[in-house]
Amino acid sequence: MFQLGSLVVLCGLLIGTSESLLGDVANAVNNLDILNSPSEAVAQNLNLDVGSLQQATTWPSAKDSILETLNKVELGNSNGFTPLNGLLLRVNKFRVLDLQAGLSSNGKDIDLKLPLVFEISFSLPVIGPTLDVAVSLDLLNSVSVQTNAQTGLPGVTLGKCSGNTDKISISLLGRRLPFVNRILDGVSGLLTGAVSILLQNILCPVLQYLLSTMSGSAIQGLLSNVLTGQLAVPL
């Protein structure tokens, strides 16, 4: 009888603790901010080689350079967890599958879409490094060409970079103790938005820096090809 009573008390404590942890995780997720700006520091910190991209004058060569550079980027510390906006994560696997282009809804700009796949480990509040997820996500960014009034040369203008949360897919890798599983199931919905923001914070500054180094003629050529139907890639 004593054992049964102790078990009831223990279950009550676990339920209360899990509710508290869910609240802690929710607070961490809600406090995430989106960082979205290209910076010279991005290239310096990641040791990006943009020489071939700067020399590219056609879209095919620029696309190849962007994909090659992105797929070589070391995202965080592969041997440990990287702090990011109150959460800790480690990117175990990462790949950009493609770089697709299409005409934007205004008929003047180019919309770029990058399908991404990740395997990520999260360290959640109190629980520790217990959550491994596989993620597929589309990263979106618009670009346009504007003529420099002083030089008369075309220049690249960047739109907002964002993750397409309508297309995000998250799968939990492996299961653990029932107590931990309950917490993971409870936060899986929260993680959809959190993962999108975290990946935007990691990749958007990198992508925008790469796009900012492109020649205007490469984007102008891409826009001309899309407008004339020579390049029609559905987004």
Swiss-Prot record:
Q: Which coarse location class describes where this protein primarily resides?
A: secreted
Q: Name one GO cellular component term.
A: extracellular region
| InterPro entries tied to this protein | Bactericidal_perm-incr_a/b_dom, BPI_fold-antibacterial, Lipid-bd_serum_glycop_N
What organism does the record attribute this protein to?
Answer: Rattus norvegicus
Which positions form S-S bridges? C161-C204
> What GO terms in the biological process aspect are recorded for it?
defense response to bacterium
Q: Give the stretches traversing the membrane.
A: none
Tissue expression, as annotated, is: Expressed in parotid, submandibular and sublingual glands.
Q: Does the keyword DNA repair apply?
A: no
Q: Mind listing the UniProt keywords for this protein, alphabetically?
A: Antibiotic, Antimicrobial, Disulfide bond, Secreted, Signal
Q: Which family does it belong to?
A: Belongs to the BPI/LBP/Plunc superfamily. Plunc family.
Would you tell me the protein name for this molecule?
A: BPI fold-containing family A member 2
Function of the protein: Has strong antibacterial activity against P.aeruginosa.
Q: Which domain of life is it from?
A: Eukaryota
